Amino acid sequence: MTLWLGPGPLVLASQSRARQALLSNAGIPFDAIPADIDERGIAKASGLSAPGEIAALLAQEKAAFVSNHHPGRLVLGADQTLALGARGFNKPADRNEAAKQLRELAGRRHELHAAIALVRNGVTLFADVSIARMTMRPLNDEEIAAYLDLAGDKATSSVGGYQVEGLGVHLFDGIHGDHFTILGLPLLPLLGFLRSQKLLAF
């Protein structure tokens, strides 16, 4: 029996290993084709400030970009933003910026906004934004330095300077939200839509 009933593999407009692993583990065949867009430029030009709205816009833009180059294919775009109060964060450019972000987040609760958009032939068929709330434990400079030493390049590959599926889990006191949302791909609403479109066997 085949789970996926689509005419061809889904297209994932992302190079995120976490997102690719989530789709693979769920049995969804896909081709990973990252979108070549200027995320910061698009977000700035939009005038949007709400993290969830920015994530939704970027997920849509990624999917639309790849859809324009692959007509007829079902394209999944995804994006995730981090907000501490009203302030949004970007991926740290280097270790120093990662340390700065961790100092700001330590001992406080922040939100992760994960957005997805499904697009075919430039038309958005489905979109969703999910939120997870993350409470980082208090950290001193020595603990932050130790974490960054161990995390290496992974500290600059994710917003906030951490990957909660790895060593980043040691930074937290509390996590409230969907596991898939935290990893940047709200899988349950995605699967629900695919089922509604008769693209899954069950």
From Swiss-Prot:
> Which cofactors?
a divalent metal cation
Gene Ontology BP terms: nucleotide metabolic process
| Signal peptide region | none
Q: Which CDD domains match?
A: Maf
What Enzyme Commission number(s) does the record list for this chain?
Answer: 3.6.1.9
A Pfam family this protein belongs to? Maf
What's an example GO cellular component term for this entry?
Answer: cytoplasm
Summarize the protein's role.
Nucleoside triphosphate pyrophosphatase. May have a dual role in cell division arrest and in preventing the incorporation of modified nucleotides into cellular nucleic acids.
Protein name stated in the entry: Nucleoside triphosphate pyrophosphatase
Give the source lineage, highest ranks first. Answer: Bacteria, Pseudomonadati, Pseudomonadota, Alphaproteobacteria, Hyphomicrobiales
